[in-house]
């Protein structure tokens, strides 16, 4: 599995010359890993254990992510991962994309990681922008009016000045599995992105 991941990342890096490579790390079904004999064997081999903070499966994901981080960095690139990469620990140079809430971004900044804020509560443009959805194009759900987007402050007020320097900015997302055409995409994005 690790060789496969490295091969995929090598090909991605060959195609895309960007400074950063996003390696994901979100929505990883750790409940499956609890039942997976190969995963449990690897957990045992690595001596990973549940503790007060995380499960052995969280630490297994951290092991995989840390290996991929090293692989990417060995190729002269920097790693970005979704905020789940904080669960179980991560390398010091990983940039965290905080999507589930601002909490992951806050925690990442407190741990001195660079952070891109992209919380689904404010910046997921595949959500409805009106609460009257009867005549709206189908959306994945949620409701984010323009006012909520515009009120979003990417730097949490409780961060120290030094921690706040790690907030690189914000990013809005438009996931397209429910977007039928470009007109719908533009409708979802504007005026929220304006």
Which residue ranges define each predicted feature?
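Substrate-binding cleft of carbohydrate-active enzyme catalytic domains
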Residues: 1-77
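Flexible, acidic glycine-rich loops studded with aromatic residues
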Residues: 78-94, 98-194
């Amino acid at each position: 599995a690790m060789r496969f991941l490295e091969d995929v990342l090598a090909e991605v890096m060959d195609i895309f010359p960007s400074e950063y490579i996003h390696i994901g790390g979100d929505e990883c079904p750790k409940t499956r890993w609890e039942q997976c004999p190969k995963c449990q064997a690897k957990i045992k081999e690595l001596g990973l254990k549940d503790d007060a903070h995380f499960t052995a499966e969280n630490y297994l994901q951290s092991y995989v992510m840390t290996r991929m981080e090293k692989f990417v960095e060995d190729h002269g690139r920097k790693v970005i991962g979704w905020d789940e990469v904080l669960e179980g620990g991560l390398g010091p140079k990983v940039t965290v994309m905080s999507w589930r809430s601002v909490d992951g971004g806050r925690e990442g900044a407190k741990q001195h990681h660079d952070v891109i804020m992209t919380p689904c509560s404010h910046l997921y443009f595949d959500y409805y922008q009106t609460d009257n959805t009867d005549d709206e194009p189908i959306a994945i759900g949620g409701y984010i009016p323009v006012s909520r987007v515009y009120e979003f402050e990417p730097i949490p007020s409780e961060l120290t000045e030094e921690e706040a320097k790690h907030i690189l900015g914000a990013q809005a997302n438009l996931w397209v599995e429910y977007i039928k055409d470009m007109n719908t995409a533009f409708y979802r994005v504007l005026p929220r992105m304006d």
